[in-house]
Regions:
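Metal-dependent amide/peptide-bond hydrolase catalytic core
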Residues: 24-141
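Bacterial N-terminal signal peptides that target proteins for export
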Residues: 2-12
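Bacterial N-terminal signal peptides
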Residues: 11-21
């Protein structure tokens, strides 16, 4: 006679092992927002550009975290304006320690990309022009 317990135990063990293997890999999504003063390309020529800062940041992310996936890139609102904002998401995978290390690298890349855009336009951190913050600022959530 067939014992149901002898069938259930191996199946349960296999299911448990598969679940444990899946639980080892984790994912994290970072939402990056970059803002600057923006402006019209004629009257505000030379202002920092949030889309340019995002592009610089994404290129640096690609170098420092090659397996990261950058998605949902948005920014600017017109062909003749200097973008005041840019947003993108970074998808990371790995265990907890790897995620922390990758998130730190993404943060460093975004900081470096934004600093590069500020430096390219000769803007110092905290500088004010025409009553507005003149530099690129960023957040990661």
């Amino acid at each position: 006679m067939l014992n149901i317990r002898t069938l259930i135990r191996p199946a349960a063990a296999l299911l448990l092992a598969a679940s444990a293997a899946c639980a080892m890999a984790a994912g994290q999504t970072l939402a990056v927002s970059i803002i600057g003063p923006g402006g019209h390309s004629n009257g505000n020529y030379g202002h920092v550009n949030a889309v340019h800062a995002a592009a610089r940041s994404i290129m640096l992310i690609e170098k420092s975290v090659p397996d990261a996936v950058v998605t949902a890139v948005t920014g600017g609102n017109s062909v003749n304006s200097i973008a005041a904002y840019a947003n993108f998401r970074v998808l990371l995978e790995g265990d907890d320690a790897a995620l922390k290390a990758k998130a730190d690298k993404v943060k460093a890349a975004v900081e470096e990309g934004c600093k590069a855009e500020n430096a390219f336009r000769g803007v110092k951190t905290g500088e004010v022009r025409d009553g507005l913050a003149a530099d690129i600022r960023w957040t990661i959530k």
